């Protein structure tokens, strides 16, 4: 938390976490302004999109707390910086994580730039994460902080603070969102507060109920913001060309037909369309009713490969290679033993980091990792400190 009282623009999403964040900051004496971000044009999607109701909820929260709220449309920025990349990744056969890119490009870039124009000293969101000032490093270079339009200001801020900024996991391990924030830069962290990062979710709900916030009992949002509650395949079908092809098992036996490789992801169990197919002979694990999982996508031959059983060797990887690395400190960690997540909510897995050139790195695991998926993020940790990460390119 910031000891200095200053103007803080809070991203009010219409949910309980951002609402309590705004209230906590006002209690600390900050000048708090709410800002609701509209990141998707939903004019044709009334059945699925909840942004109108979310704004009404955010406005009600602002009224109860006694702060101003501004409505800002970042839909154009979102389409250019996030959604276009999302589609490119799916077209290439990978499974992207748009929430990671949205945080780096919209919630902590477009939002931050807008807040600075409003005279804010900092921004705040309802993410479950923490920011800590690290000890000063001798001869600390200024270079990594040039990534932001506010770079010059933030270099001075970091020098004043006596060191770099670290991104830490939220104290509530079950709600920690540092995985989605691993691409934030020093410039962004220098301007960011996470007021609920020090609290368990149960305490956030208790505070909201105690001060009678209208969203105290509102369910947490789920899914990708621009998809809402609609079936994922239905949504992608509007934007991606697709061609049906064979579904085969590891022996090359055709089991059915897929509707387009882009609609499937590694480790997927539901919606494959071969639920009634049994493995002939003794299946792995001794059960011919073991579920089928997507294991590989052969794009040159437009073939989807599936295997039976959660623990099938095709679903296990001891090594991954990643690219497009982004490091919180601005430079890669030293080679050696760390921990990593290859998907959200996964337990930290011990690994050995081997940094490479041009934003690439390799991770080697002592224990096989399940369904490591190209396009998803591999995020590295040193204890509670999130070091950054990259986009998974391949696994073996």
UniProtKB/Swiss-Prot annotation:
Domain of life of the source? Bacteria
Q: What Enzyme Commission number(s) apply to this enzyme?
A: 2.8.1.13
One GO CC annotation, please? cytoplasm
Catalytic reaction(s) noted? S-sulfanyl-L-cysteinyl-[protein] + uridine(34) in tRNA + AH2 + ATP = 2-thiouridine(34) in tRNA + L-cysteinyl-[protein] + A + AMP + diphosphate + H(+)
Where are the active-site residues found?
A: 102 (nucleophile), 225 (cysteine persulfide intermediate)
One Pfam family recorded for the sequence? tRNA_Me_trans
Q: Where is this region: Interaction with target base in tRNA?
A: 97-99
Q: Name one GO biological process term.
A: tRNA wobble position uridine thiolation
Q: Which UniProt keywords apply?
A: ATP-binding, Cytoplasm, Disulfide bond, Nucleotide-binding, RNA-binding, Transferase, tRNA processing, tRNA-binding
* Region described as Interaction with tRNA: spans on this chain: 175-177, 343-344
Q: Name the predominant localization.
A: cytoplasm
Residues binding ATP: 11-18, 37, 126
What does it do?
Answer: Catalyzes the 2-thiolation of uridine at the wobble position (U34) of tRNA, leading to the formation of s(2)U34.
Q: What is this protein called?
A: tRNA-specific 2-thiouridylase MnmA
Identify the species of origin: Methylibium petroleiphilum (strain ATCC BAA-1232 / LMG 22953 / PM1)
